From Swiss-Prot:
The gene is rplP. It comes from Mycoplasmopsis synoviae (strain 53). The keyword Ribonucleoprotein applies. This is Large ribosomal subunit protein uL16. Residues 1-30 are annotated as: Disordered. Disulfide bonds: none annotated. HAMAP family: Ribosomal_uL16.
Length: 139
């Protein structure tokens, strides 16, 4: 699963996912096809990993899956049955905010039909609505 090696702060303040459109990372850069978010949400490292596995299993040994997002923020939680107070809980999960129009995954090295099918399978594992886009200038 994806998580940072080191962070400046172990427990960040709670932030809301930004509902504005992304102006960086909103085009297909490395592959031929991409999975672009239509809504915004927090995406967990486990969701990213399950989407990656779904896409790579669909492709087999051909092609590459490129992950364009990384979970930098930790989500803290306290154990079940612990009363309120006595500090903040320990980090449990890692999240990343995904803005509207952010390209989440890219695929290269396969035909358009196989790339679209792999991205469709990966998109169903994510908590955002999505669409499949092609690289500009590639048919």
């Amino acid at each position: 699963m994806l998580q940072p090696k080191r962070t400046k702060y172990r427990k960040p303040f709670l932030q809301s996912h930004d509902k504005r459109k992304a102006h960086k990372g909103n085009k297909v850069s490395f592959g031929s096809h991409g999975l672009q978010a239509v809504t915004s949400a927090w995406v967990d490292s486990r969701q990213i990993e399950s989407a990656r596995i779904a896409a790579t299993r669909s492709l087999g040994r051909e092609g590459n899956v490129i992950i364009r997002i990384f979970p930098h923020f930790s989500k803290t939680s306290k154990p079940i049955g612990v009363r309120m107070g006595s500090g903040k809980g320990s980090p449990e999960k890692w999240y990343t905010p995904v803005k509207v129009n952010t390209v989440v995954f890219e695929i290269q090295g396969v035909s358009a039909e196989r790339a679209k099918e792999a991205l469709r399978l990966a998109g169903h594992k994510l908590p955002v609505k999505w669409k499949i886009i092609e690289k500009e200038g590639v048919n």
